[in-house]
Structure formats: C-alpha cells, structure tokens
C-alpha cells in the first residue's frame, strides 16, 4: 500500500515537472517576434527616412516631424519586438529565394551603412524616442554587426 502511494506521489511530481517544462516552452515561444504576426511588415518606414536624414543629411526639411512619426512607429511595436524591428530596418528580411526585402539601410559612398546602423541602434534611447526594449537577461541591444 505504501509503495502505491509513493508511485502515485512520484507520478504526480513527474507530471508537474512535464507541465512546468511545457509552460516554459510556451512562454519562450510567446516572446519570439514574428514579422507580420507580432508587428506589421515594414513597421519602421519613417524611421528609415529619419536615419538617412540624421546620418546622411538628406531627406525632409523638417526632421523633428519625421522623428515624431518614427517614434510613433517604434512605440507601436511591442516592446519585446523592438530589437527585431530595428534589425529588420537595418538588415531587411531575406526571402526563401535569397532576396532581401523590407527595411535595409543601404551603403552609400558619402553615408556609410555602419554609421546608419550605429544611429538606428540608438532610436530606443532617451535621447531619441525614449522607449524601453525588453531583452533576455544579460543581452544588450547590439545591432552593429552586419546581418
């Protein structure tokens, strides 16, 4: 009888462990950001214009209006997806055929892509849009490496 009770308790503990692992897996999947699902395609179109204006000095004559629109676009992206949205702004999205679509800051002779990327990575900061960005513990927003 005591043996059956131990088996029952052990089975319950194993079941709880399996449920905990399943819940953790579902939570981690929820934290992933999918373009077109968690945020729209090309969500930062105005931010592209703003980055070019600030870094390259080309574009609209009223950069503060463009900045406000960019910040609104970035604020509309869920905070846990902002790094991914900025990555898409800088690197675009590679299709299964290998084409790069959406976003993608271009390399220009008088305006290097790395300078554009460095500035784009600051859009969530207090000096620009003053937005939070949720990241995994110990992970910094590092968007300077070419994707």
Swiss-Prot record:
SMART domains (UniProt xref): AAI (SM00499)
Keyword annotations from UniProtKB, A to Z: Alpha-amylase inhibitor, Disulfide bond, Protease inhibitor, Secreted, Serine protease inhibitor, Signal
Signal peptide: 1-21
InterPro entries listed in its UniProt record: Allergen/soft/tryp_amyl_inhib, Allergen/tryp_amyl_inhib_CS, Bifun_inhib/LTP/seed_sf, Bifunc_inhib/LTP/seed_store
Coiled coil: none
Gene Ontology CC annotations of this record: extracellular region
Transmembrane regions listed in the UniProt entry: none
Expression sites (tissue/organ): Endosperm.
A family per Pfam: Tryp_alpha_amyl
Function (record text): Alpha-amylase/trypsin inhibitor.
Protein name: Alpha-amylase/trypsin inhibitor
Species this chain originates from: Hordeum vulgare (Barley)
């Amino acid at each position: 009888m005591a043996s059956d009770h131990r088996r029952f308790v052990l089975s319950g503990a194993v079941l709880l462990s399996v449920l905990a692992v399943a819940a953790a897996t579902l939570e981690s999947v929820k934290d992933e950001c999918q373009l077109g699902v968690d945020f729209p395609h090309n969500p930062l179109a105005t931010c592209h214009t703003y980055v070019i204006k600030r870094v390259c000095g080309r574009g609209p004559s009223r950069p503060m209006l463009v900045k406000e629109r960019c910040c609104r676009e970035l604020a509309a992206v869920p905070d846990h997806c902002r790094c991914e949205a900025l990555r898409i702004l800088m690197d675009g999205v590679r299709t299964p055929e290998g084409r790069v679509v959406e976003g993608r800051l271009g390399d220009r002779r008088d305006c290097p892509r790395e300078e554009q990327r460095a500035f784009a990575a600051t859009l969530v900061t207090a000096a620009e849009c003053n937005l939070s960005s949720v990241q995994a513990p110990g992970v910094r927003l590092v968007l300077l490496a070419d994707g």
